[in-house]
Amino acid sequence: MPLRVVGAGRANEGLRADWQEQLATVQREIGFQYIRMHGILNDDMGVYTEDSHGNPQYNFQYVDALYDALLKLHIRPFVELTFMPSKLASGPQTVFWWKGNITPPKDPAKWSALIRAFTAHLKERYGEDEITHWYFEVWNEPDLHNLFFTGNVDDYLALYKNTAEAIKTECPACRMGGPASAVPWKFEEAFEQYIVANNVPAAFVSSHAYGVTKGFLDAAGNAGTVLDPSPDSISGRMKHSRELIQHSGRPNMELHFTEWSSSYTPTDYLHDQYHEASFILDKIKRAVPYVDSMSYWTFTDIFEENGPRFTPFHGGFGLMNLEGIRKPSYFAYRFLGQLGTEDIASDDSQSWITRSSDGSIQALLWDYTPIVPPAPETDQSFYKKEQPATVKGTLQLRLDHLRDGNYQVTIYTIGYGKNDAYTAYLHMGAPSQITRAQLENLNAVSKGEPESTERYQVNHGKFSRDLPLRTNDVYLVVLTPSEVFDATPKKASR
């Protein structure tokens, strides 16, 4: 589940070569199943216009170029159906630098025809069996009135019904849902009541969650935010959303959190810091019982809601920065991608122990110590600065019931100064533009290579290791049977 879905900014950005190159790296080293982004129907995707007589004209060339590239990288679209093509819009209101229109359609019949044509085209190009594995989400955060949607809850529900029925007409087995809400829980409850009362198709409920206690979402990304230190931030929101579904008339619907992160602004330097890695692991581990997926917002800092960014690190959402430098958050997901398929019980909540079919054991361990900026500071000022870790003592790893024999023990780390490109960037003087040599140096300190490797003889089924622990350190300890390790082709470092 943790590697099911990841986010990206907007569809048109996905046509860029550097965006696709970064996603190729993500897929090679992590491997998500789905990707969600804004704006597949935006004017910059050229999907819809009208002739001089008001007759609809459809064009899916940019959509094809994007979706072809995604499928080639073995990642499927989690289709967010936004925003309103200007020729269909009922008003001029837009959001972001790239001007996504946030109004309902002026002609619901023309909107329905567009959705039918879009779905029929996808079915023809990719096959009905393929697109039944996709998800179709209607709109984005319609509960943020006049930010993402100018209508009210009734307007959204009417839009949802129109859209879902149009998709079902062309693809009866396709999966659609909503409301992609930002605020708990008004729209979720209204959505669930409406689809039951009106027999409207829906396969899933979607919502968003961010781990802050202060601030608000503004299109310019200037609001100050403060980390929520509660253990139940993120997961508590998801738990209640699951309970709402269970008590609805459709208790078997899936629950997808199609955006989540530590903060909802692309100017929060916690996103760049090493603390984000342990935050991600802790929140995912707590949320797993409640959700079918949670889509980290986003995989890349190639993200233009506020327009092109002027520095290589600026608190952007991405797992990778503009130049493709891997952040500590990237390695949290990479470590998750190295876990095995069978969970093993652990008595420590800040751990994830697994086994692979070849007998390898993976122990993912972390210290999550939330550090709240002292008032009146916010994440924007506090986490912009270097944040040395504090020594906490020794982490004791003890594994029992292993098969006796020789193992290759490989240890990977994330933390202050370890796979920590942002701290290295600060030590360079935080240049507003980086040279090729500086880029090479930053990539060199964030390659994810093992901290140590050694052979270990397991006797009586036991393995033990003491590891030095600082605040927000992360360890991945992999025990691979020597015969498996020796037979595995070794990859060259990139």
Regions found by a protein language model. Give the residues of each.
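Short, solvent-exposed loop/turn elements at domain surfaces
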Residues: 1, 12-17, 45-46, 215, ...
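Substrate-binding cleft and catalytic face of glycoside hydrolase catalytic domains
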Residues: 30-229, 240, 251, 265
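Mature N-terminal, pre-catalytic/accessory segment of carbohydrate-active enzymes
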Residues: 1-33, 471, 483-494
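Conserved, mostly hydrophobic/aromatic
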Residues: 5, 70, 118, 136, ...
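C-terminal beta-strand-rich structural cap/linker in extracellular carbohydrate-active enzymes
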Residues: 433-494
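Aromatic/acidic polysaccharide-binding cleft in carbohydrate-active enzymes
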Residues: 257-383, 415
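Carbohydrate-binding surface patches
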Residues: 347-430, 464-466, 471-478
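Short, acidic/polar
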Residues: 13-27, 186-195, 277-283
